Regions:
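Conserved class I S-adenosyl-L-methionine
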Residues: 1-36
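Conserved catalytic/acceptor-binding region of the Class I
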Residues: 120, 125-194
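A short, conserved alpha-helix within the catalytic core of class I
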Residues: 110-118
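Conserved Class I S-adenosyl-L-methionine
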Residues: 168-255
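Class I S-adenosylmethionine-dependent transferase superfamily signal
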Residues: 55, 118-119
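Short catalytic micro-motifs in class I SAM-dependent methyltransferases
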Residues: 105-106
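A short acidic, Gly/Pro-enriched loop at the edge of an enzyme's catalytic core
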Residues: 89-100
Length: 255
């Protein structure tokens, strides 16, 4: 199931997801020692283009693909980027076209072996596939009770749907696709939310979208429930607090 295929999911995704990507691109630029823009970069599973737009800082020609036409309808409002609908494992581009391929918070939905073979086909010699994640662990600054609420209340009510989180990024899996994992980097992103902003973010998660799509809940009902539950963590409607996201980056090089 494509949890991000509906118009409702796309609009909420674009509004609610935090803009952390520029920070990650800074890490990528430093590791690759980029002192000039790359010619071409491709962002796969680009969603509404938040991660794709960030690539404009390091590439002259930027492309984005996603399986969801509704996501791309939102993304296409941004000039200077070429978007098209395509599954991660079958991209509509010629061999050896890109200096960089990125995936932000999407690889766990792929057939990863097929995707790696496709990424190898798309990349120029020695170019990088960079996969990164900005995961929400339920960590709120100076408020340990929020982590308990996230685990014992929120995720029990809305459990995460199945995804591919167990892939082994080992030489045994990567070498047949002519890839090598050259580095894994981990750090935290601090994001400030007020209650409405945190609610808007949480309803973009697949564990919320899944029960909406199956008609067990409505977005309106979940929003009301979240705002009631979250009120205890915010002094008023305008108070903003820091939440920490776990960011990791995998740098895979074509060999």
């Amino acid at each position: 199931m494509n949890y991000f295929g509906s118009q409702a999911a796309a609009v909420r995704y674009d509004k609610g997801r935090p803009h952390f990507h520029a920070n990650t691109i800074g890490h990528i630029k430093a590791y690759l020692h980029l002192d000039h823009k790359l010619d071409s970069a491709l962002d796969i599973a680009c969603g509404t283009g938040l991660s794709t737009k960030a690539l404009l800082a390091i590439a002259s020609n930027v492309f984005g693909t996603d399986l969801s036409e509704e996501m791309l309808k939102v993304a296409r409002a941004e000039d200077g980027i070429t978007y098209c609908v395509a599954p991660a494992e079958r991209q509509p581009f010629p061999d050896n076209k890109f200096d960089l391929v990125t995936v932000s918070s999407g690889v766990h939905w792929f057939n990863i072996d097929e995707f790696l073979a496709e990424a190898n086909r798309l990349l120029k010699k020695d170019a990088f596939l960079i996969i990164y994640e900005n995961a929400f662990p339920g960590k709120m600054e100076d408020q340990t009770d929020f982590a308990r609420w996230n685990k014992e209340v929120y995720l029990r009510r809305f459990p995460s749907p199945p995804r591919n989180n167990t892939y082994q990024w080992t030489p045994a899996n990567l070498e047949p696709k002519k890839m090598v994992l050259s580095r894994t980097e981990s750090f935290q992103n601090a994001v400030k939310f007020n209650r409405d902003e945190l609610t808007a973010y949480l309803i973009t998660q697949s564990n919320v979208i899944a029960p909406v799509e199956s008609a067990k809940f409505t977005y309106a009902a979940i929003e009301r429930w979240l705002k009631t539950e979250l009120a205890v963590f915010f002094e008023n409607d305008h108070a903003r607090h820091v939440f920490y996201f776990n960011n990791w980056i995998k740098y895979l090089q074509k060999i």
